[in-house]
Amino acid sequence: MPSWSAVSFGALDLRGTELGEQGFDLVVVPARPAVPVFLMGRGAEVWLMIAQGRGGELETDEEALEVLSSLEEMGIASREPGHSAQLQGVTQPWLVSPIHELVYALLAHVAAAHDIEILFIKGPALHAQGLRSRQHSGDVDCWVQPGDDLRLAEAMRSWGWKPLYSPFTGTGVTHSLTLDAGDWGCAIDVHTRFPGIDSPPHASFDIVRAESEPRVFASTSCLTPRVALHGIVAALHAVRPFVGSPAGAAELEEASAVLRAAGVETIELAERVNAVYALEEPLRRAFPAEARSYESARPPADWGWRLTASAPRRHLRALRTVPLRKKPAVILRLLWPTVAMMEAAGEAPGTSWRRKAATRVQRVAAAVRRLLAMR
């Protein structure tokens, strides 16, 4: 008899949880594109046995062999020796939402299958590290190298996520690419940098990766930043400008409180990733005895357009930061976006060619009017 193994892109033991009280024993993400499978009764028992390496006990159990065949069809059991998605054990959920926890594991497996280095930032890990009181996040934030965001976004299509591309995608202007949740109900933000960190994206990723540690999500080992580095990320999130508005007193106090909780090591790390312009005041408040002056610090490249309230002016300022060779394509997409870009912006371009063209013409006319009004 071939040796059976439990395979999965994420799995949780639900016994003792609210879902367990409803009769579900396990939830397992198949090792191929599909929705999570909820197991109970004999199916859960057999799957757990092969996950524990006890498949040999089932060799003469005809009922168990039929169950194994069904599990194989579901994509959660395999007779392939050394399967890349073989699971050795199953953990219980520690996130408020088990489905969100499965998304972390799924992303880690999909990224590994495409040779993409991936880190997970913000979210429940901040709560676990004592850096925020809120436990749950509505989406999952991950961080990859520039260019890998597009590869990961396309790889996640088959799992039900849709990338929301913008005219600035791939130019370095946008710091993340959002993947629409679909049936999973959990959006994903794929970061290639973080606002306020002004070191080159590849270099900052390397620093964050070096300052990360393993954390298990849905039976899968993932990487999240250590406390000090994660404190910098959380503080930057608090103080970044939003639609023309700079950080106010509440945001500055929130950032300083996070940095204080993360420890004095954040000063050196902020200097290493070049986040001192954005964090100078919060760092001074958090650590007055160790306060340093950063008079030569320059605003991050995206701070200018983030502080611009007018959408046309914001687009123009952002356009100035785009490499020259990419500007024509960005201008074209700003004026004449793809249907997917219009839908991502919340517009309804219609289904007919005529309606789509009319919507685009209306956009061009509106853009011209706004530009003339700026004069």
PLM region descriptions:
Residues 1-138, 144-375:
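Conserved NTP-donor binding/palm subdomain of two-metal-ion nucleotidyltransferases/polymerases, i.e.
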